[in-house]
Amino acid sequence: MVNLTGSAGAGQSIAGRHPFWLIGWAALWMASLGNAALWRELAQLHLLDGVGGLALGAGIGVLLVALLAALLGLLAWRATLKPALTLLLVASALGTHFMFTYHVVLDATMVTNVLQTNPGEARDLMGLRFFATVLLLGLLPAVWVWRTPVRPLRVARRAAQNAALVLGALALAATVVLASYQPLSSAMRNHRHVRYLANPLNMVHALGRLAARPLQRDESVLLALGEDAQRGPSYAVHARPPLLVLVVGETARSANFGLNGYARPTTPELAALNVVSFRNAWACGTSTAASLPCMFSHLGRSAFESRSTNVENLLDVLQGAGLAVLWLDNQSGCKDVCARVPAQAAAVPGNPLCSGGECFDEIMLQGLDQRIAALAPQQRTRGVVLVMHPMGSHGPAYHKRSPAAFKRFMPECASNVLSDCSTQELVNAYDNTIAYTDHFLASTIAWLKAREGAADTALVYVSDHGESLGESNLYLHGLPYAIAPDVQKHVPWITWLSSGFERRSGTTMACLRQQTDARVTHDNLFHSMLGLMDVRSSVYRRELDMHAVCAVP
Protein backbone atom coordinates (compact mmCIF):
# COMPACT_ATOMS: atom_id res chain seq x y z
CA MET A 1 0.00 0.00 0.00
CA VAL A 2 1.40 3.36 -0.97
CA ASN A 3 1.52 6.20 1.51
CA LEU A 4 0.92 9.28 -0.62
CA THR A 5 1.69 11.70 2.19
CA GLY A 6 5.39 11.46 1.49
CA SER A 7 6.52 8.56 3.71
CA ALA A 8 6.35 4.79 3.48
CA GLY A 9 5.95 2.38 6.32
CA ALA A 10 7.81 -0.89 6.79
CA GLY A 11 6.75 -3.51 4.32
CA GLN A 12 4.96 -1.05 2.09
CA SER A 13 5.64 -1.13 -1.63
CA ILE A 14 7.00 2.01 -3.19
CA ALA A 15 5.20 3.28 -6.31
CA GLY A 16 6.77 5.58 -8.85
CA ARG A 17 10.25 6.41 -10.02
CA HIS A 18 12.97 7.94 -7.90
CA PRO A 19 13.28 11.69 -8.68
CA PHE A 20 16.87 11.15 -9.83
CA TRP A 21 15.62 8.84 -12.57
CA LEU A 22 13.62 11.70 -14.08
CA ILE A 23 16.53 14.09 -13.64
CA GLY A 24 18.92 11.70 -15.35
CA TRP A 25 16.74 11.16 -18.39
CA ALA A 26 15.90 14.87 -18.70
CA ALA A 27 19.58 15.82 -18.44
CA LEU A 28 20.51 13.27 -21.12
CA TRP A 29 17.69 14.50 -23.38
CA MET A 30 18.71 18.15 -23.10
CA ALA A 31 22.43 17.42 -23.39
CA SER A 32 21.88 15.47 -26.61
CA LEU A 33 18.89 16.54 -28.75
CA GLY A 34 18.45 19.78 -26.82
CA ASN A 35 21.98 20.76 -27.79
CA ALA A 36 21.70 20.03 -31.51
CA ALA A 37 23.04 23.50 -32.32
CA LEU A 38 26.10 22.96 -30.11
CA TRP A 39 26.90 19.54 -31.57
CA ARG A 40 26.48 20.86 -35.12
CA GLU A 41 28.82 23.76 -34.41
CA LEU A 42 31.45 21.50 -32.84
CA ALA A 43 31.27 19.21 -35.88
CA GLN A 44 31.52 22.09 -38.36
CA LEU A 45 34.55 23.42 -36.50
CA HIS A 46 36.11 19.92 -36.81
CA LEU A 47 36.47 19.77 -33.04
CA LEU A 48 34.96 16.27 -33.01
CA ASP A 49 37.32 14.82 -35.62
CA GLY A 50 39.53 11.85 -34.77
CA VAL A 51 40.04 10.06 -31.49
CA GLY A 52 40.90 13.30 -29.71
CA GLY A 53 37.75 14.94 -31.03
CA LEU A 54 35.58 12.06 -29.90
CA ALA A 55 37.15 12.27 -26.45
CA LEU A 56 36.47 16.01 -26.35
CA GLY A 57 32.87 15.43 -27.43
CA ALA A 58 32.38 12.78 -24.77
CA GLY A 59 33.83 15.11 -22.16
CA ILE A 60 31.53 17.96 -23.20
CA GLY A 61 28.55 15.60 -23.14
CA VAL A 62 29.33 14.38 -19.64
CA LEU A 63 29.98 17.96 -18.52
CA LEU A 64 26.58 19.08 -19.82
CA VAL A 65 24.79 16.18 -18.11
CA ALA A 66 26.62 16.83 -14.85
CA LEU A 67 25.87 20.56 -14.82
CA LEU A 68 22.22 20.00 -15.71
CA ALA A 69 21.94 17.36 -12.99
CA ALA A 70 23.48 19.76 -10.47
CA LEU A 71 21.03 22.48 -11.47
CA LEU A 72 18.06 20.13 -11.25
CA GLY A 73 19.32 18.77 -7.94
CA LEU A 74 18.72 22.21 -6.47
CA LEU A 75 15.12 22.01 -7.66
CA ALA A 76 14.40 18.34 -6.95
CA TRP A 77 11.66 18.92 -4.41
CA ARG A 78 8.19 17.46 -4.59
CA ALA A 79 6.51 20.77 -5.49
CA THR A 80 9.20 22.07 -7.82
CA LEU A 81 10.75 19.15 -9.71
CA LYS A 82 8.18 18.68 -12.47
CA PRO A 83 7.53 22.42 -13.03
CA ALA A 84 11.30 23.00 -13.21
CA LEU A 85 11.77 20.14 -15.66
CA THR A 86 8.92 21.47 -17.79
CA LEU A 87 10.37 24.98 -17.92
CA LEU A 88 13.84 23.73 -18.79
CA LEU A 89 12.59 21.30 -21.44
CA VAL A 90 10.49 23.98 -23.17
CA ALA A 91 13.27 26.56 -22.83
CA SER A 92 15.71 24.03 -24.26
CA ALA A 93 13.40 23.42 -27.23
CA LEU A 94 13.02 27.15 -27.87
CA GLY A 95 16.76 27.68 -27.64
CA THR A 96 17.40 24.76 -29.99
CA HIS A 97 15.06 26.19 -32.61
CA PHE A 98 16.53 29.68 -32.65
CA MET A 99 20.17 28.65 -32.35
CA PHE A 100 19.85 25.86 -34.91
CA THR A 101 17.73 27.87 -37.38
CA TYR A 102 19.38 31.29 -37.19
CA HIS A 103 22.85 30.39 -35.86
CA VAL A 104 22.46 32.90 -33.04
CA VAL A 105 23.74 32.49 -29.49
CA LEU A 106 21.88 33.14 -26.26
CA ASP A 107 23.45 35.58 -23.82
CA ALA A 108 22.00 38.25 -21.53
CA THR A 109 21.52 40.72 -24.39
CA MET A 110 19.74 38.18 -26.58
CA VAL A 111 17.48 37.11 -23.71
CA THR A 112 16.67 40.79 -23.15
CA ASN A 113 15.70 41.04 -26.81
CA VAL A 114 13.42 38.02 -26.40
CA LEU A 115 11.76 39.46 -23.30
CA GLN A 116 11.13 42.76 -25.13
CA THR A 117 9.81 41.19 -28.33
CA ASN A 118 6.38 42.50 -29.30
CA PRO A 119 3.61 40.29 -30.76
CA GLY A 120 4.36 41.31 -34.34
CA GLU A 121 8.03 40.40 -34.03
CA ALA A 122 7.11 37.13 -32.34
CA ARG A 123 4.79 36.19 -35.22
CA ASP A 124 7.61 36.73 -37.70
CA LEU A 125 9.74 34.20 -35.83
CA MET A 126 7.11 31.47 -35.72
CA GLY A 127 6.37 28.87 -38.35
CA LEU A 128 5.89 25.15 -38.86
CA ARG A 129 9.48 24.35 -37.90
CA PHE A 130 9.17 26.43 -34.73
CA PHE A 131 6.04 24.62 -33.54
CA ALA A 132 7.39 21.19 -34.56
CA THR A 133 10.62 21.74 -32.61
CA VAL A 134 8.86 22.99 -29.49
CA LEU A 135 6.38 20.10 -29.65
CA LEU A 136 8.91 17.32 -30.21
CA LEU A 137 11.76 18.56 -28.02
CA GLY A 138 9.81 20.38 -25.33
CA LEU A 139 6.12 19.71 -24.94
CA LEU A 140 6.03 15.95 -25.53
CA PRO A 141 8.90 15.27 -23.09
CA ALA A 142 7.15 17.58 -20.60
CA VAL A 143 3.95 15.54 -20.94
CA TRP A 144 5.99 12.40 -20.29
CA VAL A 145 7.44 14.04 -17.17
CA TRP A 146 4.00 14.81 -15.79
CA ARG A 147 2.67 11.33 -16.59
CA THR A 148 5.56 9.63 -14.81
CA PRO A 149 4.80 9.01 -11.12
CA VAL A 150 7.57 10.03 -8.74
CA ARG A 151 8.33 8.17 -5.53
CA PRO A 152 7.50 10.24 -2.42
CA LEU A 153 10.38 10.75 0.01
CA ARG A 154 10.67 12.23 3.47
CA VAL A 155 11.89 15.83 3.43
CA ALA A 156 15.07 15.07 5.36
CA ARG A 157 15.95 12.15 3.11
CA ARG A 158 15.19 14.17 -0.02
CA ALA A 159 17.35 17.05 1.21
CA ALA A 160 20.28 14.72 1.88
CA GLN A 161 19.95 13.03 -1.50
CA ASN A 162 19.60 16.35 -3.33
CA ALA A 163 22.74 17.65 -1.65
CA ALA A 164 24.58 14.47 -2.58
CA LEU A 165 23.43 14.80 -6.19
CA VAL A 166 24.52 18.43 -6.46
CA LEU A 167 27.92 17.78 -4.89
CA GLY A 168 28.47 14.59 -6.86
CA ALA A 169 27.48 16.22 -10.16
CA LEU A 170 29.75 19.21 -9.52
CA ALA A 171 32.59 16.86 -8.60
CA LEU A 172 32.05 14.97 -11.86
CA ALA A 173 32.00 18.24 -13.81
CA ALA A 174 35.24 19.35 -12.15
CA THR A 175 36.85 16.00 -12.94
CA VAL A 176 35.87 16.29 -16.61
CA VAL A 177 37.24 19.84 -16.83
CA LEU A 178 40.54 18.81 -15.26
CA ALA A 179 40.85 15.70 -17.42
CA SER A 180 40.02 17.58 -20.64
CA TYR A 181 41.48 20.94 -19.67
CA GLN A 182 43.90 21.41 -22.55
CA PRO A 183 41.58 20.58 -25.49
CA LEU A 184 38.56 22.11 -23.76
CA SER A 185 40.27 25.40 -22.91
CA SER A 186 41.77 25.57 -26.40
CA ALA A 187 38.34 25.09 -28.00
CA MET A 188 36.73 27.74 -25.78
CA ARG A 189 39.60 30.18 -26.31
CA ASN A 190 39.67 29.84 -30.10
CA HIS A 191 35.88 29.64 -30.53
CA ARG A 192 34.44 31.81 -27.78
CA HIS A 193 30.91 31.72 -29.16
CA VAL A 194 30.64 27.98 -28.44
CA ARG A 195 30.11 28.58 -24.72
CA TYR A 196 26.90 30.49 -25.51
CA LEU A 197 25.45 27.41 -27.24
CA ALA A 198 25.31 25.19 -24.13
CA ASN A 199 21.55 24.84 -23.87
CA PRO A 200 19.63 25.59 -21.61
CA LEU A 201 22.50 26.52 -19.29
CA ASN A 202 23.13 29.56 -21.47
CA MET A 203 19.63 30.87 -20.73
CA VAL A 204 19.92 30.12 -17.02
CA HIS A 205 23.20 32.04 -16.92
CA ALA A 206 21.73 34.94 -18.91
CA LEU A 207 18.66 35.17 -16.68
CA GLY A 208 20.91 35.05 -13.64
CA ARG A 209 22.91 37.99 -14.96
CA LEU A 210 19.74 39.94 -15.67
CA ALA A 211 18.38 39.16 -12.20
CA ALA A 212 21.65 40.35 -10.63
CA ARG A 213 21.61 43.71 -12.40
CA PRO A 214 19.63 45.44 -9.63
CA LEU A 215 22.48 44.45 -7.30
CA GLN A 216 25.00 46.05 -9.66
CA ARG A 217 22.89 49.05 -10.70
CA ASP A 218 20.34 50.99 -8.69
CA GLU A 219 17.44 51.11 -11.15
CA SER A 220 15.43 53.34 -8.80
CA VAL A 221 17.87 56.21 -9.22
CA LEU A 222 17.93 58.46 -12.28
CA LEU A 223 20.72 61.01 -12.30
CA ALA A 224 20.00 64.36 -13.91
CA LEU A 225 22.21 65.32 -16.84
CA GLY A 226 23.12 68.64 -18.38
CA GLU A 227 21.11 70.79 -16.01
CA ASP A 228 23.18 73.75 -17.20
CA ALA A 229 22.14 73.21 -20.83
CA GLN A 230 21.34 76.42 -22.71
CA ARG A 231 20.65 77.39 -26.27
CA GLY A 232 23.67 78.96 -27.94
CA PRO A 233 24.00 82.33 -29.72
CA SER A 234 22.65 81.02 -33.04
CA TYR A 235 19.13 81.21 -31.62
CA ALA A 236 19.42 84.98 -31.21
CA VAL A 237 21.12 85.55 -34.56
CA HIS A 238 18.90 83.48 -36.86
CA ALA A 239 15.23 84.26 -37.31
CA ARG A 240 14.10 80.75 -38.21
CA PRO A 241 14.14 78.00 -35.57
CA PRO A 242 15.98 74.72 -36.23
CA LEU A 243 14.05 71.59 -37.21
CA LEU A 244 16.24 68.49 -37.03
CA VAL A 245 14.99 64.99 -37.83
CA LEU A 246 17.06 62.20 -36.30
CA VAL A 247 16.19 58.86 -37.87
CA VAL A 248 17.36 55.89 -35.81
CA GLY A 249 17.57 53.17 -38.44
CA GLU A 250 16.72 49.54 -37.72
CA THR A 251 19.03 46.66 -38.65
CA ALA A 252 20.66 48.48 -41.57
CA ARG A 253 24.19 47.39 -42.41
CA SER A 254 26.64 49.70 -44.11
CA ALA A 255 27.81 47.06 -46.57
CA ASN A 256 24.48 47.08 -48.45
CA PHE A 257 24.23 50.85 -48.95
CA GLY A 258 25.00 51.96 -52.49
CA LEU A 259 26.27 55.25 -51.02
CA ASN A 260 29.02 53.27 -49.29
CA GLY A 261 30.29 51.44 -52.36
CA TYR A 262 27.85 48.53 -52.59
CA ALA A 263 27.65 47.29 -56.18
CA ARG A 264 23.86 47.34 -56.29
CA PRO A 265 21.92 50.62 -56.66
CA THR A 266 20.12 50.37 -53.33
CA THR A 267 20.24 54.13 -52.55
CA PRO A 268 19.63 56.04 -55.81
CA GLU A 269 17.33 58.68 -54.31
CA LEU A 270 19.77 59.64 -51.56
CA ALA A 271 22.62 59.71 -54.07
CA ALA A 272 20.68 62.25 -56.13
CA LEU A 273 20.26 64.46 -53.05
CA ASN A 274 24.00 64.72 -52.52
CA VAL A 275 23.86 63.71 -48.86
CA VAL A 276 26.99 62.96 -46.85
CA SER A 277 27.49 59.31 -45.93
CA PHE A 278 30.04 58.44 -43.26
CA ARG A 279 31.38 55.09 -44.43
CA ASN A 280 33.30 54.14 -41.29
CA ALA A 281 30.54 54.23 -38.67
CA TRP A 282 30.20 51.67 -35.87
CA ALA A 283 27.44 50.73 -33.45
CA CYS A 284 27.77 50.39 -29.69
CA GLY A 285 25.76 47.17 -29.65
CA THR A 286 24.48 44.40 -31.87
CA SER A 287 20.81 44.66 -30.88
CA THR A 288 18.25 47.40 -30.40
CA ALA A 289 18.02 46.71 -26.67
CA ALA A 290 21.76 47.27 -26.31
CA SER A 291 22.37 50.02 -28.87
CA LEU A 292 19.40 52.33 -28.47
CA PRO A 293 19.97 53.39 -24.83
CA CYS A 294 23.74 53.42 -25.40
CA MET A 295 23.73 55.69 -28.45
CA PHE A 296 21.64 58.36 -26.69
CA SER A 297 23.88 58.27 -23.61
CA HIS A 298 26.79 60.63 -22.97
CA LEU A 299 28.81 57.83 -21.38
CA GLY A 300 30.07 55.93 -24.41
CA ARG A 301 29.89 52.18 -24.88
CA SER A 302 32.39 51.04 -22.23
CA ALA A 303 31.14 53.31 -19.45
CA PHE A 304 27.50 52.71 -20.35
CA GLU A 305 27.82 48.95 -19.94
CA SER A 306 29.47 49.28 -16.52
CA ARG A 307 27.29 52.12 -15.14
CA SER A 308 26.04 51.74 -11.57
CA THR A 309 23.04 54.07 -11.96
CA ASN A 310 20.79 55.25 -14.76
CA VAL A 311 21.40 58.69 -16.20
CA GLU A 312 19.29 61.01 -18.33
CA ASN A 313 20.12 61.08 -22.02
CA LEU A 314 20.41 63.31 -25.08
CA LEU A 315 16.66 63.90 -25.35
CA ASP A 316 16.49 65.09 -21.73
CA VAL A 317 19.31 67.57 -22.33
CA LEU A 318 17.71 68.94 -25.51
CA GLN A 319 14.37 69.29 -23.76
CA GLY A 320 16.05 70.84 -20.74
CA ALA A 321 17.56 73.48 -23.02
CA GLY A 322 14.04 74.57 -23.92
CA LEU A 323 13.61 72.76 -27.24
CA ALA A 324 10.62 70.68 -28.30
CA VAL A 325 11.37 66.97 -28.62
CA LEU A 326 9.11 64.31 -30.14
CA TRP A 327 9.75 60.57 -30.48
CA LEU A 328 7.76 58.94 -33.30
CA ASP A 329 7.84 55.15 -33.27
CA ASN A 330 7.07 52.59 -35.98
CA GLN A 331 9.00 49.89 -34.16
CA SER A 332 8.96 48.04 -30.85
CA GLY A 333 9.36 51.06 -28.58
CA CYS A 334 12.16 53.33 -27.44
CA LYS A 335 13.69 51.13 -24.69
CA ASP A 336 13.03 53.96 -22.18
CA VAL A 337 15.05 56.49 -24.19
CA CYS A 338 11.89 58.58 -24.72
CA ALA A 339 10.46 58.00 -21.24
CA ARG A 340 10.51 61.71 -20.32
CA VAL A 341 9.69 63.36 -23.66
CA PRO A 342 6.54 63.32 -25.80
CA ALA A 343 6.30 60.02 -27.69
CA GLN A 344 3.76 58.68 -30.14
CA ALA A 345 3.19 55.51 -32.13
CA ALA A 346 3.07 56.12 -35.87
CA ALA A 347 0.49 53.43 -36.68
CA VAL A 348 -2.88 54.64 -37.98
CA PRO A 349 -5.53 51.87 -38.02
CA GLY A 350 -7.15 51.49 -41.40
CA ASN A 351 -4.44 53.36 -43.26
CA PRO A 352 -3.44 51.76 -46.61
CA LEU A 353 0.17 51.75 -45.42
CA CYS A 354 -0.77 49.48 -42.51
CA SER A 355 -1.64 45.80 -42.53
CA GLY A 356 -1.50 42.97 -40.03
CA GLY A 357 -0.63 45.26 -37.14
CA GLU A 358 2.39 46.76 -38.94
CA CYS A 359 2.90 49.85 -41.08
CA PHE A 360 5.39 50.77 -43.76
CA ASP A 361 7.73 53.53 -42.62
CA GLU A 362 6.17 56.25 -44.79
CA ILE A 363 3.32 56.28 -42.28
CA MET A 364 5.54 58.47 -40.10
CA LEU A 365 5.34 61.31 -42.64
CA GLN A 366 1.55 61.41 -42.61
CA GLY A 367 0.06 64.00 -40.28
CA LEU A 368 3.54 65.05 -39.18
CA ASP A 369 2.77 68.78 -39.21
CA GLN A 370 -0.17 68.18 -36.89
CA ARG A 371 1.96 66.10 -34.53
CA ILE A 372 4.55 68.87 -34.31
CA ALA A 373 1.89 71.57 -33.96
CA ALA A 374 0.57 69.74 -30.89
CA LEU A 375 3.88 70.17 -29.05
CA ALA A 376 4.24 72.87 -26.39
CA PRO A 377 4.16 76.20 -28.30
CA GLN A 378 6.94 77.92 -26.37
CA GLN A 379 9.42 75.10 -26.94
CA ARG A 380 8.27 74.51 -30.52
CA THR A 381 8.96 78.09 -31.58
CA ARG A 382 12.53 77.78 -30.28
CA GLY A 383 13.31 74.61 -32.21
CA VAL A 384 12.24 71.01 -32.75
CA VAL A 385 14.13 67.73 -32.62
CA LEU A 386 12.04 64.93 -34.12
CA VAL A 387 13.29 61.38 -33.58
CA MET A 388 11.92 58.74 -35.94
CA HIS A 389 12.27 55.04 -35.15
CA PRO A 390 11.33 53.15 -38.34
CA MET A 391 10.80 49.46 -38.97
CA GLY A 392 13.67 49.59 -41.45
CA SER A 393 15.19 46.20 -42.24
CA HIS A 394 13.96 44.27 -39.22
CA GLY A 395 14.17 40.53 -39.82
CA PRO A 396 13.67 37.71 -40.30
CA ALA A 397 10.60 38.65 -42.38
CA TYR A 398 12.49 41.09 -44.60
CA HIS A 399 9.91 40.66 -47.36
CA LYS A 400 7.32 42.38 -45.15
CA ARG A 401 9.40 45.56 -44.82
CA SER A 402 9.16 46.82 -48.41
CA PRO A 403 6.05 47.65 -50.48
CA ALA A 404 5.59 45.98 -53.86
CA ALA A 405 6.78 49.11 -55.69
CA PHE A 406 10.22 48.83 -54.06
CA LYS A 407 10.87 45.15 -54.64
CA ARG A 408 13.57 45.83 -57.22
CA PHE A 409 15.61 42.72 -56.56
CA MET A 410 13.81 39.47 -57.25
CA PRO A 411 13.18 36.71 -56.45
CA GLU A 412 13.22 37.47 -52.75
CA CYS A 413 13.11 35.24 -49.70
CA ALA A 414 9.56 35.08 -48.34
CA SER A 415 10.29 32.70 -45.45
CA ASN A 416 11.15 33.42 -41.85
CA VAL A 417 13.47 30.38 -41.89
CA LEU A 418 16.28 32.18 -43.67
CA SER A 419 18.41 29.09 -44.19
CA ASP A 420 15.62 27.68 -46.39
CA CYS A 421 16.26 30.44 -48.95
CA SER A 422 19.17 30.74 -51.33
CA THR A 423 21.77 33.35 -50.50
CA GLN A 424 20.66 35.45 -53.46
CA GLU A 425 16.99 35.35 -52.44
CA LEU A 426 17.91 36.40 -48.91
CA VAL A 427 20.12 39.26 -50.08
CA ASN A 428 17.41 40.36 -52.52
CA ALA A 429 14.82 40.58 -49.73
CA TYR A 430 17.22 42.53 -47.53
CA ASP A 431 18.31 44.87 -50.32
CA ASN A 432 14.67 45.67 -51.02
CA THR A 433 14.38 46.93 -47.44
CA ILE A 434 17.38 49.19 -48.01
CA ALA A 435 15.84 50.47 -51.24
CA TYR A 436 12.68 51.35 -49.33
CA THR A 437 14.72 53.00 -46.56
CA ASP A 438 16.38 55.07 -49.31
CA HIS A 439 12.95 56.23 -50.49
CA PHE A 440 11.72 56.91 -46.96
CA LEU A 441 14.76 59.04 -46.11
CA ALA A 442 14.56 60.91 -49.42
CA SER A 443 10.87 61.57 -48.76
CA THR A 444 11.72 62.87 -45.29
CA ILE A 445 14.30 65.23 -46.77
CA ALA A 446 11.69 66.40 -49.30
CA TRP A 447 9.32 67.07 -46.39
CA LEU A 448 12.07 69.10 -44.69
CA LYS A 449 12.86 71.03 -47.87
CA ALA A 450 9.21 72.05 -48.16
CA ARG A 451 9.52 73.72 -44.74
CA GLU A 452 12.75 75.63 -45.30
CA GLY A 453 10.84 78.90 -45.40
CA ALA A 454 9.76 78.43 -41.78
CA ALA A 455 12.72 76.54 -40.28
CA ASP A 456 16.39 75.71 -40.74
CA THR A 457 16.14 72.00 -41.47
CA ALA A 458 18.48 69.01 -41.18
CA LEU A 459 18.40 65.22 -41.14
CA VAL A 460 20.72 62.72 -39.49
CA TYR A 461 20.26 59.00 -40.07
CA VAL A 462 22.17 56.30 -38.22
CA SER A 463 21.29 52.64 -37.75
CA ASP A 464 21.20 50.97 -34.35
CA HIS A 465 23.11 47.88 -35.50
CA GLY A 466 23.81 45.77 -38.57
CA GLU A 467 22.79 42.28 -39.65
CA SER A 468 24.21 38.92 -40.69
CA LEU A 469 22.84 37.49 -43.93
CA GLY A 470 24.28 33.99 -43.82
CA GLU A 471 27.98 34.89 -43.76
CA SER A 472 29.76 32.19 -41.77
CA ASN A 473 26.30 30.58 -41.40
CA LEU A 474 25.17 33.44 -39.16
CA TYR A 475 21.80 35.16 -39.46
CA LEU A 476 20.09 38.17 -37.86
CA HIS A 477 22.07 39.95 -35.13
CA GLY A 478 22.66 40.03 -31.39
CA LEU A 479 25.96 38.16 -31.04
CA PRO A 480 28.05 39.28 -28.06
CA TYR A 481 29.93 42.40 -29.17
CA ALA A 482 33.38 40.91 -28.69
CA ILE A 483 32.72 38.05 -31.10
CA ALA A 484 30.15 39.61 -33.43
CA PRO A 485 31.18 39.95 -37.10
CA ASP A 486 31.68 43.44 -38.48
CA VAL A 487 28.45 43.29 -40.50
CA GLN A 488 26.52 43.36 -37.21
CA LYS A 489 28.44 46.45 -36.01
CA HIS A 490 29.26 48.46 -39.16
CA VAL A 491 26.31 50.79 -39.79
CA PRO A 492 25.28 53.56 -42.20
CA TRP A 493 25.40 57.17 -40.97
CA ILE A 494 24.02 59.91 -43.21
CA THR A 495 23.79 63.69 -42.76
CA TRP A 496 21.88 66.27 -44.78
CA LEU A 497 21.87 69.98 -43.93
CA SER A 498 19.80 72.64 -45.64
CA SER A 499 21.58 75.86 -46.59
CA GLY A 500 19.84 77.60 -43.71
CA PHE A 501 21.07 74.98 -41.25
CA GLU A 502 24.58 75.25 -42.69
CA ARG A 503 24.58 78.97 -41.93
CA ARG A 504 23.22 78.64 -38.39
CA SER A 505 25.53 75.76 -37.45
CA GLY A 506 28.62 77.00 -39.26
CA THR A 507 28.96 73.48 -40.68
CA THR A 508 28.99 72.94 -44.42
CA MET A 509 28.18 69.84 -46.39
CA ALA A 510 31.29 70.46 -48.49
CA CYS A 511 33.49 70.20 -45.41
CA LEU A 512 31.68 67.12 -44.10
CA ARG A 513 32.34 65.35 -47.40
CA GLN A 514 36.03 65.53 -46.61
CA GLN A 515 35.41 63.52 -43.42
CA THR A 516 33.46 60.57 -44.83
CA ASP A 517 36.21 58.03 -44.14
CA ALA A 518 36.87 59.18 -40.56
CA ARG A 519 35.93 56.60 -37.95
CA VAL A 520 32.79 57.51 -36.01
CA THR A 521 30.81 55.50 -33.48
CA HIS A 522 27.60 55.78 -31.52
CA ASP A 523 29.75 57.42 -28.84
CA ASN A 524 29.78 60.50 -31.10
CA LEU A 525 26.01 60.87 -31.46
CA PHE A 526 25.26 62.62 -28.16
CA HIS A 527 27.88 65.32 -28.62
CA SER A 528 27.33 65.69 -32.36
CA MET A 529 23.62 66.38 -31.87
CA LEU A 530 24.31 68.96 -29.17
CA GLY A 531 26.81 70.57 -31.52
CA LEU A 532 24.43 70.71 -34.48
CA MET A 533 21.62 72.09 -32.32
CA ASP A 534 23.97 74.60 -30.66
CA VAL A 535 23.12 73.47 -27.15
CA ARG A 536 25.82 74.49 -24.69
CA SER A 537 26.45 72.32 -21.63
CA SER A 538 29.31 71.11 -19.46
CA VAL A 539 28.55 67.54 -20.58
CA TYR A 540 29.37 68.40 -24.21
CA ARG A 541 32.78 67.15 -25.40
CA ARG A 542 33.99 68.81 -28.56
CA GLU A 543 36.46 66.01 -29.33
CA LEU A 544 33.51 63.62 -29.70
CA ASP A 545 31.50 65.97 -31.93
CA MET A 546 31.93 64.52 -35.42
CA HIS A 547 30.87 67.82 -36.99
CA ALA A 548 33.13 70.05 -34.89
CA VAL A 549 36.04 69.86 -37.32
CA CYS A 550 33.81 71.60 -39.86
CA ALA A 551 32.08 74.04 -37.52
CA VAL A 552 32.96 77.70 -38.04
CA PRO A 553 31.83 79.93 -35.13
Model regions: which residues?
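Charged, amphipathic alpha-helical stretches
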Residues: I23-A31
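Catalytic domains that recognize anionic headgroups
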Residues: V2-G16, F20-L22, G34-T133, L139-P553
